[in-house]
Amino acid sequence: MMPDKPFRVGRSATGLGLFAAAPIEKDADIVEYTGPRIPTREAQALDRRRANKYLFEIDRRWTIDGSPRSNVARYVNHACDPNAEAVLSRGRMMFRAVKDIAAGAEITIDYGDEHVALYFKSGCRCESCGPR
């Protein structure tokens, strides 16, 4: 029997992460990144102060504040060689598999160099990069 959702929140090397509860096929939508939309200018001010690490800019005008705990997509961690990507479709931010993901594997996206530089004090420590 397939689980209701193709993912589960669990312990990862960096705290909590989102893991495949069952195999996920390449190009499948996994989870939507949800939360209130705030003006991007307001989000940029929060970002500069590092007041909220769950901001996801969707365009020049709007940013999703993914900090509410109901947004399970906030647990998707960074990897330099990710197995998912963020895709904007009809104003919704979806995480989609870029390769087949085995059951039990952590679901990851590439946060981008700017985010990694701002929030990862010791640099990237993903599985591809390892501890430095």
Question: In which residue ranges do the predicted regions lie?
Answer:
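Catalytic cores of histone-lysine modification enzymes
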Residues: M1-A86
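C-terminal SET catalytic tail plus cysteine-rich post-SET Zn-binding segment of SAM-dependent SET-domain
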Residues: A79-R132
